[in-house]
């Protein structure tokens, strides 16, 4: 029996199972390998000699080193390899052709390769070439195709594209970077109007006749990335976007002199980086606007998720007569910079009535004279609390890159103070997340944790609400990306909750390299209804009515607890000062200092409690004796 099994195993071990597979399946398997690696299989046998070439997707990159016997780079080897693969394929159908080559490649060869795949009906063409074309113009047959669905062209030397006869009726994705559109009138308009089903458009570093009068009109476009950052930063004369079905919009440009026909009816996400020119920055002042981007903001005012760069925050201050109301905005992302002020943020936050999530990418900003005004900045002011914070509807606050110090003007203490200020003044805040680098010192995080405890306690006192504090651990994350909040899960909650979560963004992959950090988190929960006593939720169910009755019964208790807590605030200050002194004198970390202080206080108070108990017992005995004598 064992001998038979060994014979069967021996027969299977000698048999070439892969070679017996259908050739179509073998070609499909080889298509998952780089073509340079799959070409090595041609030496296995005669059957494998040409199989590597029959693959629907061809990707060539001359970054793979092609060396001659002397060890020097030889571009001819790369050119011969591409020619051989294409000749072996013959008229074999091709789906994707990707070519990445530098300025050593012969433009005649590149033109021949492009013509070959275009004649065979390629649907996905990806060209990233630095080639010195004849007359500087790319082959015109690229832009005349019924089969092309995805087209990407990226040059490093600004090659010309002749769009006189462009015809791409089935193109859905277009990516252009560092190209010059050549046309008798307006090359960009001609190109877009010739793409009848275009859905995804990426434009960067391109130029055409009429470049300063930018106009884009497309009823089918859904995603648009538009980079027009000039080296000399010139203000465009006019900008027009007629894209009613656009849902994703990334736009980098200088402030235009005029905005017209801004149609973004379906916009969901927008990332805006508008900037002023050097001339505008020189003459910008609070009394004199140097531009007007109001019409552009009105066009995107129905967006749901908005990301604003620091330059855009400055544009809102110096180039905007009025900030419109963003009635549908639920998530706002602010990218900060130490050279840009926050003067426009108070008005912007006021004009976001349904804002749920606020995200700061860093806490950097330029200190200006407006920082001392109540509604001139988000900084803590001695004149009062900004109304944009005291009446803010924000429920989720996230701060990326907390503690990042860019220059000598950045201060860790200011960032901690700003976090505490947000927590104290934003009444509807339910959750705060801080993402910080593991290089931040442990004592800084420990101090922040203690301040969070105290700030949360004071906030509960000021609001005169009964809380039940509890501790949770730091959320350890191996990535630096923040997940998108699930807004819907919070809209139907009847209970009031507030939590702060400190999260480390790890910069290294191995968890064993992470420094130990004391886990801490604070979450508070109020098991009471937030509805009004009368006139609210009249159509609510029995549970809502019961919650309202619970509020009525517990109202007096809440006030008593709040008053008692206010009386104990001095004791909290005293205990916190003791912990700080122990930490400074002994050198222990914060948690060890808290434990040591606890034992110290217990050691002092227990004898006093025993003595008080003895005195109370003696007093009771004396009273009993006096009662017996009477």
Curated annotation (Swiss-Prot):
Gene3D superfamilies xref list: 1.20.1280.50, Ribonuclease Inhibitor
Alphabetical keyword list: Leucine-rich repeat, Repeat
One Pfam family matching this protein: F-box
Disulfide bonds, paired cysteine numbers: none
CDD domains attached to this UniProt entry: F-box_AtFBL13-like
The LRR repeat ranges on this chain: 101-129, 152-178, 180-205, 228-253, 300-325, 337-362, 406-436, 437-465, 567-590
F-box domain sequence ranges: 15-63
PANTHER family on file: RNI-LIKE SUPERFAMILY PROTEIN
Protein name: Putative F-box/LRR-repeat protein At3g49150
Organism field: Arabidopsis thaliana (Mouse-ear cress)
